[in-house]
Amino acid sequence: MVTKEQRRQKIKARVRGKISGTQERPRLTVFRSNKQIYAQLIDDIAGRTLASASSLKLEMTGSKKEIAAKVGDEIAKAATEAGISTVVFDRNGYLFHGRIKELADAARKGGLKF
């Protein structure tokens, strides 16, 4: 029987074969744990993280969805400071629902295009 984590890893590998981030259009990847949420802008060609934001770093309070939205705002601010306006969104095998969707919507409102 395939567990949820094995299913996610399979989807993640399939999607990562198709998308890649560059300096001009980095990959916005999201990692979700039970308590925290993390977002990174990655240049896959150089293998560098250009910007990052997380609920752990910001020490926020509120519901998990509210925190995800704040992390989305923070990654959008970090991207604009780095001169990035368009990204490739990598949901990392998670469903585009709940906290992932809140983070993506907040990043879009913050000025990122994907």
Swiss-Prot record:
It comes from the Bacteria. Transmembrane segments: none annotated. Gene3D superfamilies: 3.30.420.100. GO terms for molecular function: 5S rRNA binding; structural constituent of ribosome. One of its GO terms (biological process) is translation. Keywords: Ribonucleoprotein, Ribosomal protein, RNA-binding, rRNA-binding. It holds the Pfam family Ribosomal_L18p. CDD domains: Ribosomal_L18_L5e. One of its GO terms (cellular component) is cytosolic large ribosomal subunit. InterPro entries: Ribosomal_uL18_bac-type, Ribosomal_uL18_bac/euk. Belongs to the universal ribosomal protein uL18 family. Part of the 50S ribosomal subunit; part of the 5S rRNA/L5/L18/L25 subcomplex. Contacts the 5S and 23S rRNAs. This is Large ribosomal subunit protein uL18. It comes from Porphyromonas gingivalis (strain ATCC 33277 / DSM 20709 / CIP 103683 / JCM 12257 / NCTC 11834 / 2561). The gene is rplR.
